[in-house]
Regions:
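Alpha-helix capping/helix-boundary segments
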Residues: 10, 37, 99, 117-118
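Acidic, PIN/NYN-like endoribonuclease modules and their adjacent C-terminal/linker elements
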Residues: 38, 104-136
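PIN-domain endoribonuclease scaffold, especially VapC-family toxins
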Residues: 26-28, 35-84
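Short, well-structured N-terminal submotif of metal-dependent ribonuclease cores
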Residues: 1-35
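Active-site neighborhoods of divalent-metal-dependent phosphate/nucleic-acid chemistry enzymes
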Residues: 71-110
Length: 136
């Protein structure tokens, strides 16, 4: 299964050695993340360090390990679906247009997110952590 990761899923995997991290590291899924959203992970680095108790070195190591299992989707691949994604999310959450555009760019993909607002759209299938865990 092709799975687009919402930024909060990656943050969760960084904060603790959780089900989320285990799924990313051990499942047979193909994981994707929009290159365009890497800044969001960097933006929360201090928060992650505080919550997790990780040193910067440990944080960098875990991030590098996670991204061995996550394929970055170049912005150019996402741009062709940006307008459609924007229409889908314009009255829901404009911050998440990038994840819808990424899913539209990767055939037969789903989004992994625990954010409820994704339920307000019906163009892209969205699975919660519990559902992903049951499939892995």
């Amino acid at each position: 299964m092709k799975v687009i990761l919402d930024v909060n899923i990656i943050l969760s995997a960084l904060i603790r050695d959780s089900t989320t991290r285990k799924i990313i590291l051990n499942s047979e899924f193909d994981f994707y993340f929009p290159e365009l959203s890497l800044h969001k992970i960097r933006k929360y680095k201090d928060y992650i360090l505080e919550k997790s108790g990780l040193s910067e070195e440990e944080y960098d190591k875990i991030l590098a390990i996670l991204f061995k299992y996550i394929q970055l989707v170049p912005t150019e691949e996402i741009e062709k679906n940006w307008d459609e994604a924007k229409k889908i999310m314009e009255h829901i959450d404009k911050e998440d247009v990038v994840f819808i555009a990424t899913a539209l760019s990767i055939e037969d993909s789903v989004i992994w997110s625990d954010d409820r607002h994704f339920e307000k759209q019906d163009k892209v299938k969205v699975l919660k952590t519990k559902e992903i865990a049951n499939l892995s």
